[in-house]
Amino acid sequence: MTPDSPAVPQDDVPQGDVPQGGGAESVRSLELFFDLVFVFAITQIATVLVEHPNPGGLARAALLLAITWWMYGGYAWLTNALDLDRTGPRLMLLLGTAGFFVMSQAVPRAVGPGPWAVVFGAAYLVVVLVHFFAFQGTSGQRGIHRIGPYNLASALVVLAAGFVAPEQRVWVWALAGLMEWVTPWLSGVGGFTVGVGHFVERHGLAVIIVLGESVTEVGAAASHLDDLTTVLVGSLLALAASAALWWLYFDREEEASAALLERVPAEERPRAALWSFGYAYLFLILGIAVAAVGMQKAIDSFRHPLHGLPGALLPLGVALYLAALAAFHRALAGDWPRRRLVTAAAVLAAGVPALRWSSGGTALAVTTALLAGLVCWESAAQRGAALRSRDA
């Protein structure tokens, strides 16, 4: 089975409340507790890039995020099917939470020598096994029996990575990530059900989590600086940029995605969910994390040029977020939002030269201005479409 990208017409998208497809519940407090560990995981993965602001550090951070996000997403699918009012499922989710917590503890030191890469792999194996067994007796049992063996194989590869030299470990992680993300092409995604309301809300919270972590990290980094102007102006520019990223997803995209996913036939919905909230979302989350590190670097070099990869992280992360958001929209609506792609190209074209030849502050201001411009552009387009629809 090949998971072809679905296309659903965008016209007549409902604009009301996020639909609760299939009787899905809202996100429960235990899931929010689980998400606290994901906050920690994102912080730790960002630390890898902060401490190693070079192509190798970026590759390692991206691979660790890809591996982590695969199973975080898997747990979102799991809780979509679990009855968390029962003690057994609660304990299984808490056991998975413990596995994620140990993984997160190990992340920064897993890239170097010592036992931490083995600890990361062992915890990951626990997370995968808990995920498999927790699905038993749920609506996704048939689906996990198809995909579970591939998850187990990739987890064993992650564990094996801990026994190779740090220089070669990145290649083993790459193999594990590749195995995971091509799994749907091998096993298919049949056998799962997607309750739309809970599923969309769950993933929206992940975006909030990563955006919140980025604001916290930027604020903490700026607070260690002595220059008042740098701290205040830099922090506010970074906050405005993060707010624009929030706006671009939550102003309309989340609600529209729920309506579009609801309209996909139930048997095709897992594929649509995989393409939009799986593949596209990975790069969306990665874009926010990279942009957050780039904001920190830009504030650190607020009055001076910033060369090398650190000078590209801010525009690269923002452009990646916009491109991923465009791909997310394409996976569900069937068309490419050109305004986002144009702005992504503009951010790269303006942001990198500004960082390298002017200053971090200039680049941060330019990037924030471009994002604000995109927000205004999209808002004006939506108002125009609404007026045309009303007059028709």
Regions from the PLM with identified roles:
Residues 2-22, 26-28, 62-82, 87-91, ...:
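Predominantly late transmembrane helices and immediately cytosolic-facing juxtamembrane segments
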Residues 332-335, 350-364:
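Membrane-helix boundary connector in multi-pass membrane proteins
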Residues 385-392:
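Short, charged juxtamembrane terminal tails flanking transmembrane helices
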Residues 149-151, 340-349, 367-369:
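Central hydrophobic cores of alpha-helical transmembrane segments
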Residues 154-162, 346-357:
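Alpha-helical transmembrane segments of multi-pass membrane transporters
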Residues 168-172, 358-368:
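Loop-to-transmembrane alpha-helix initiation sites
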Residues 44-57, 80, 109-110, 223:
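Short, hydrophobic transmembrane alpha-helix segments
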Residues 33, 37-49:
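A structural signal for hydrophobic alpha-helical transmembrane segments in multi-pass membrane proteins
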